[in-house]
Regions:
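Arg/Lys-rich, intrinsically disordered low-complexity tails that mediate electrostatic binding
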Residues: 1-20
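Active-site-surrounding "flap" and adjacent substrate/cofactor-binding loops of secreted or lumenal enzymes
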Residues: 18, 27-30, 35-102
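Short, surface-exposed beta-strand/loop micro-motifs that present aromatic residues
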Residues: 22-24, 141-146, 460-464
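Hydrophobic/aromatic-rich, well-ordered segments within soluble, folded domains that form packed cores
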Residues: 22-42, 170-192, 561, 571-573
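Beta-sheet entry/capping signal
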Residues: 31, 141-142, 153-155, 461, ...
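Short, solvent-exposed loop/turn elements at domain surfaces
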Residues: 40-44, 165-166, 481
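Intrinsically disordered, low-complexity linker/terminal regions across diverse proteins
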Residues: 60, 206, 212, 235-244, ...
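Noncatalytic, helix-rich "gating/capping" subdomain that lines the substrate-entry/channel surface
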Residues: 66-367, 404, 430-431
Length: 664
């Protein structure tokens, strides 16, 4: 990266100071989010090892430190096979072993050349299967997902892969020429690190292939369209439609299926067809060899000190604005948590179980679901039949809160204390065997905590899984600042209450509404209700895009629609929960308004976020969530109670002059 001159640094500093002064003059009615958080913004900075700072990241740092203690103070002192695996995996990552990693790279390079010598269609499928079994990404990905149409079962899914950038514009937009030029130089130097400066690999060939592959990748909006990403095909149909012999490919994994009846999900048929034709024609050429070897180096970059530094400098520093690498022990922890997930999860719960908070959140979830059902019943735009099915879906929604009693078995591998890359390859092979073993079986029952469905118990996050109709609130988030048992209901509703309601609403957002109470994908809506919902969605899209334009921000209202529906509806639900709570305690009028003011202030506080400009640009282009200032302001703008309490007028920044209907 080029260094900024002192003149440019001073110019940027002056610009930041000018922005801060402007923000400090704001009032509640102008920009509620910045008014509430301006002091916090002025006193906080982003860590050099991150590109964001907010309540989520601060708490996750705390949890990660606890996980380190779980490892060092407890697991490492045990004599069990699982404890030995954890220690060996951790030690292997803690210190780079470049010699062993380079040896593995050279072996894999020879393997690639051996497959290329086959020069036939069978050779391609054997090579793609070999790459998958060893954890090397290729242009066609294969993974196991929940079957949207057959509740409680797994299905294979074919998708896109093998690209460093997920936006096709990156490869074609003239404005991205400097980035592509830098990426080309990065690839050249990556090859040189392992193979020396006079190697035979060509960075321009890698770029050409990635550019060609990117022509048929989906946009972010298309990736969110289930009509495009949810196509079930037999192996015979895949071969006919996509020119890809899936049956031949899958049998190389030892998976037995009926080519004329077993269905696989194809996420982007045109991409698979385009890529398959391209590979069948050219995959053994020297041009494609550069691409394959670069994907190998991408795979190996986490295990080689020089590659690791260089990949950080491009992807983390240049593209994401992260100034400094995290300590190696953090990567070692992540590696152990990924491979020995059940052991880490059990021990984390043993020593950091938030049991009282789990009881509180379970009770609060039930209250929120009751209020949501009342709102569905009162809805003015839903017909009775759709209301009935919506209510049934709420009743059927399961909630995984905190932790569960059972976890899946750990990998039965011989992990080394010195060879991280071999450890990872062993794990990938075990994981592939796990997929093969469970493909034709039902999912484990809901007494198991499944990280494939429910994330990790140590994630500071929350989820909704539409294919099993389940909300997930991991143990890690069941603590301050999200759950505070010694604080009032206004505080807890603004934090964990909002999160619960938000995840529940995901069952009814743009995507969630296409699944029934059993998690099966089919249309349970009347045409009238479906048409009305689309009109309401357009209203949300227009509001968010209009408000963001005031700040010269181009927010994609369609990309962020589902999250915006969840945000706006969740706030209105927790408002109702708080009102019921206060009425039960005979709190009305001005005294009640004080509690609602506290709700709104706490809500804005929970979402305060500092981020680098690089991260903001990436989120605006790729993320389904709106930037946090719009998550707060656009949501509050839609609240009738908020507008009344703060006396929002047409001259105010928190005013919006178009219809804002109640959705959920």
């Amino acid at each position: 990266m080029s260094k900024l001159t002192n003149k440019h640094k001073q110019k940027n500093k002056n610009k930041r100071n000018k922005t801060r002064k402007k923000l400090h003059r704001l009032k509640e009615v102008d920009n509620f989010y910045y008014f509430v958080n301006k002091d916090w913004f002025s006193k906080n900075v982003i860590s050099k090892t991150s590109n964001v700072k907010n309540a989520f990241s601060i708490l996750q740092d705390k949890v990660d430190k606890e996980l380190h203690l779980v490892l060092t103070n407890h697991i490492f002192k045990e004599k069990s096979p699982e404890a030995k695996h954890c220690k060996n995996i951790y030690d292997s990552v803690l210190t780079f072993n470049n010699e062993l990693t380079e040896k593995q790279i050279y072996l894999f390079t020879e393997e690639i050349n051996n497959y290329r010598k086959m020069e036939c269609e069978d050779g391609l499928y054997k090579f793609l299967a070999w790459a998958k079994l060893n954890g090397i990404s290729s242009p066609i990905s294969l993974h196991m997902i929940n079957d949207n149409e057959h509740h409680g079962r797994y299905i294979l899914s074919l998708g896109e892969g093998g690209l460093s950038f997920s936006l096709k514009e990156t490869y074609t937009d003239p404005k991205k020429k400097r980035l592509i030029k830098a990426y080309t130089q990065f690839i050249k130097e990556t090859f040189a690190i392992i193979f020396g400066p006079n190697n035979t690999y060509c960075a321009e060939d890698v770029i050409d292939i990635e550019r060609e592959l990117s022509k048929k990748i989906y946009t972010q909006e298309e990736n969110g369209d289930l009509n495009k990403t949810n196509m079930k095909c037999t192996s015979s149909q895949i071969k006919h439609r996509c020119d890809f012999d899936f049956y031949k490919f899958i049998t190389l994994f030892g998976i037995k299926i009926n080519k004329n009846s077993y269905k696989t999900n194809v996420e982007n048929p045109e991409y698979i067809k385009h890529t398959s034709k391209l590979m069948l024609k050219e995959w053994t050429t020297n041009k494609w060899n550069s691409f394959w070897v670069f994907r190998l180096l991408v795979f190996a970059s986490g295990f080689h000190s020089e590659l690791n530094k260089y990949f950080f400098s491009f992807f983390s520093l240049r593209l994401n604005g992260i100034l400094q690498m995290r300590p190696r022990c953090d990567y070692a922890l992540s590696f152990v948590a990924n491979i020995m997930n059940s052991t880490i999860s059990r021990k984390y719960i043993q020593y950091y179980k938030n049991a009282k908070q789990k009881v509180f959140v379970t009770e609060l979830t039930n209250k929120i679901k009751c209020v949501f059902k009342e709102r569905i019943t009162r809805s003015k735009w839903l017909t009775d039949k759709t209301k009935e099915l919506a209510l049934r879906k709420v009743d059927s929604m399961s909630c995984a809160i905190g932790y569960r009693d059972k976890y899946i078995a750990e990998p039965s591998c011989d992990f080394s204390a010195t060879d991280a890359i071999s450890n990872f390859i062993q794990f990938v092979k075990w994981d592939n065997e796990y997929v093969i073993k469970h493909l034709h079986k039902k999912m484990p029952d809901k007494t198991y905590w499944l990280r494939t469905n429910e994330g990790n118990v140590f994630d500071v996050n929350a989820y909704y899984n539409r294919s099993i109709n389940e909300m997930i609130i991991p143990n890690a988030i069941l603590q301050e600042p999200y759950v505070c048992l010694d604080k009032n209901m206004a505080y807890n509703l603004a934090s964990i209450g909002f999160i619960i309601a938000h995840e529940i609403i995901h069952g009814f957002d743009k995507l969630g509404c296409q699944f029934d109470g059993d998690g099966e994908m089919h249309n349970w809506w009347s045409k009238e209700d479906s048409d009305n919902y689309k009109k309401l969605q357009e209203e949300i899209i227009e509001q968010y895009e209009t408000v963001s334009k005031r700040d010269n921000i181009k927010l994609n209202g369609d990309l962020t629609l589902s999250e915006n529906i969840a945000d706006t509806s969740a706030l209105q639900i927790v408002e109702d929960v708080l009102e019921d709570y206060l009425v039960e305690r005979d709190i009305f009028g001005a005294e009640q308004d004080k509690h609602f003011k506290e709700l709104y202030y706490n809500y804005a506080t929970q979402w305060r976020t500092l981020m680098t400009i690089s991260r903001m640009k990436i989120l605006t282009a790729l993320d389904g969530h709106s930037l946090t200032n719009y998550r707060v302001n656009c949501t509050l703008i839609r609240s009738e109670r908020f507008r009344r309490i703060f006396n929002i007028e047409p001259k105010d920044g928190m005013y919006y002059n178009k219809p804002m209907s109640v959705i959920w």
